[in-house]
């Protein structure tokens, strides 16, 4: 199954995630993150209490809505997902990554329903967890596998940013 093979490489999926740090630079500038231990704690806190947690909840809800073919609720949840980040920069990150994922998945692993779903999604503003949830649901990837891959990608991108910023070595 293509998705199962790709889960281990999910953090490298072509969404431009390497260009974003989810606010890690600001955390460094404010002295919150200054090395390996504080980076791990920062990532843990983000997973438990930050936007990745909100993303995981939204991913699960969108997944289940898509499985039920409830496109009216999908439209409402997709619009709600645009409002869940606490900072406009995080929303922008999620939109750029979501749109990139949606374009890549539509061309590399198409599904007959993707075209009709387009009218229920915010035009050019598909946040990342929404795009992942729809693709996973339509291709019958288990929701738990999808959630784990999504969150693993967040952590891997955070570690990559930590290396780039000199917080940890390679």
Where are these regions (language model features)?
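Flexible, glycine/charged-enriched surface loops at secondary-structure junctions
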Residues: 36, 111-117, 168-170
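Internal, conserved structured core segments that host functional sites
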Residues: 56, 61, 65-137
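Electropositive phosphate-/nucleotide-binding environments in soluble metabolic enzymes
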Residues: 17, 33, 37, 53, ...
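A short glycine/serine-rich beta->alpha loop
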Residues: 4-14, 43-49, 83-90, 117-123, ...
